[in-house]
Amino acid sequence: MKTRFFILITITLSIATLTSCTNTASQPTHTVKLVGAMKNVMWKGELDGTINLDTIANKKNLYGLGPVEFLAGEILIIDGKSYQSSLVTDTSMQVEETYHIKAPFFGYANISRWQEQVLPDSIQTIQQLEAYLNAITKTLPRPFLFKLSGVVEQATIHIVNLPKGSKVSSPTEAHTGQVNYSLTDEPADIIGFFSTSHKAIFTHHDTYLHMHLITTNRKKMGHLDKVILKAPMKLYLPVNR
């Protein structure tokens, strides 16, 4: 009787272990974590930081994007390094490498493996990129982060720069003080967020994308509003494993 009981326990534990391993293996390593929501900032004026980036425990292979708390700049994490951009003048900015910042809403993921491909030459604009990503990632878990590397023929990026003490109750008010910057023939990296179900949460109401661009010399960085991508442009998608 004791022998049968021991065998039963052993089999049960073995099945539990296998189930646990299977469940762990089935979880994608690039799962996007979202903190806060764009609509709470834009419509409810919740400008305080909901996440301190320095508290993210695993910074290895980390990627992420969002605004600085109180809409005082932009944040981009790429290859485990965190960058904050802030306004200096209407024509210049400061880009600082730091994790000592907070964001009112933020999206991030640890991505250790990428699938690289060359973006078709016909994909040049944000609208074309959105349609292309939607078409080729039907089997990829969503939302997901992606990366682009290459030269941008033309681009417009912005840095939010809300005056201190401002109250916000609409997107128009949230963008008070925002400054746009134009780029021409700049080598750059773009980290983007794609989802068809996160409008007003992490993307604006008219798009599936939220992207931040940083030049390869790390001197300019901001939220990407317009772009003409120059071929060849490399697209990196997270490997689902």
Pin down the residues of each PLM region:
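Bacterial N-terminal signal peptides that target proteins for export
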Residues: M1-L8
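C-terminal motif of bacterial Sec signal peptides marking the signal peptidase cleavage site
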Residues: T17-S20
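Bacterial Sec signal peptide processing site at the extreme N-terminus
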Residues: T22-V32
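N-terminal low-complexity or amphipathic/hydrophobic leaders
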Residues: E46-A103
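Contiguous hydrophobic, core-forming segments of folded domains
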Residues: Q84-F144
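Mid-length scaffold segments of soluble, non-membrane domains
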Residues: L119-V179
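Short, hydrophobic/π-rich interface segment
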Residues: P163-N217
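C-terminal structured interaction module
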Residues: H212-R241
